[in-house]
Structures are given as structure tokens and as C-alpha cells.
Amino acid sequence: TFCDGALSRKNKELIATAIGIVTNCESCMQWHIEQAVKEGATLQEVLEAVEVAIEMGIGPATVNARFALEVMEECF
């Protein structure tokens, strides 16, 4: 599932990060942000994934995104 295909593994990890935010899964956010960074994701790319999650998840995702931002501080 997370192998390179039509979408790169990096992009799949960014998608999974956004889903983790929307579903409020902290362990998912932690894992997928770390994996996205290992696959070469930049700070800007991760931030844009967070922004998409906030846009799609409205209020609750905004609160959940704070955890993702804390993880990003550790990774960058």
C-alpha cells in the first residue's frame, strides 16, 4: 500500500498524515509525519498536508493539527 506506484510513498505518507489529523489519531500522525520526512518530505509539504486536513476537517481537525505541529517541530 505504501510502496511507490502512481503516487510516491512520500505522497502517500502525506495523505495518511492528513487522514490521521482528521480522524484524531495521534500515533498515526506521529508515524506518518516521520515516514514522510524519511521519504524526503519538506517542512512546506507537511504543512500543506496539515492545511488540507484542517480545510477538510473544519474545527476538530484544527485542534488535532496542534499535535501534528508538535511532531513536526521534532522532525525539522
Regions found by a protein language model. Name each.
Residues 1-13, 63-76:
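Acidic, glycine/proline-rich low-complexity segments that act as flexible tails and inter-domain linkers
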Residues 12-20, 49-56:
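Alpha-helical scaffold segments that form or flank carboxylate-/histidine-based iron centers
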Residues 15, 19-31:
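Short, thiol/selenol-centered motifs that function as redox-active sites or metal-ligating centers
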Residues 27-30, 34, 58-61:
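Charged/polar positions within long, soluble alpha-helices
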Residues 30-44, 69-72:
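Iron-sulfur (Fe-S) cluster-binding segments and ferredoxin-like electron-carrier domains
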Residues 47-73:
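C-terminal structural segments of small proteins and small subunits
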